[in-house]
């Protein structure tokens, strides 16, 4: 797409003779939320490294909009308990950031109250907001969020997902979000890509959220969950494994008596 912020064309990565990523096509446009899901070992971390420019693919290419500003939120950080590091000092590790800029970013994510707290003492939900604030300091056109709700309770997850949507709306940035849960994805996602070393399925949540078989499978949690159609000659079960012919994951074309 001509208005893409980033585009991967037939990207392949091989480690030790084994394909970690195979023929990956992916793009993110301004204002679009793309959620990448898949089991452990599916290549999600490798793909993120390629998006961030930390890894050069062995095949295919990664195109980025010229002078693209990327804000990256890591899955988590480990800080030595004896290190005297406040949230403010942590945010000021980003070049050019002063207290006013740090406070503004924290206010945007609803975490301004922790600005002077030792970073080791804040809660899991507060830490995720601080990491998100750090990603916003670069005024990014593209946000790359690796497990943004990790270690947060269900209520906190909903609040964080709503916050991410508001940030997208406010800044018009694209969002690439990574999840290690095959089927738990935020309802505001525009596009979901299921990765298992290759792109095995993709789609819009709205395409399946109202399907009877989908609702039957997930019950009351259906609006927050999505199963996507596979475009290959195989399917994956709920754990990401390839299932034998004759079995399937429910989709919108399922007919149940």
From Swiss-Prot:
Residue positions binding ATP: 38-45
Principal subcellular localisation of the protein: membrane
Any one of the GO BP annotations: response to zinc ion
Chain ranges of the ABC transporter domain: 6-221
Gene3D superfamilies: P-loop containing nucleotide triphosphate hydrolases
Enzyme class: translocase
Subcellular location: Cell inner membrane
SMART domains reported for this sequence: AAA (SM00382)
UniProt keywords, alphabetically: ATP-binding, Cell inner membrane, Cell membrane, Ion transport, Membrane, Nucleotide-binding, Translocase, Transport, Zinc, Zinc transport
EC number annotated for this UniProt entry: 7.2.2.20
GO cellular component: plasma membrane
NCBIfam families: PRK09544.1
Described purpose of this protein according to its UniProt entry: Part of the ABC transporter complex ZnuABC involved in zinc import. Responsible for energy coupling to the transport system.
Protein name in the entry: Zinc import ATP-binding protein ZnuC
Native source species: Pseudomonas putida (strain ATCC 47054 / DSM 6125 / CFBP 8728 / NCIMB 11950 / KT2440)
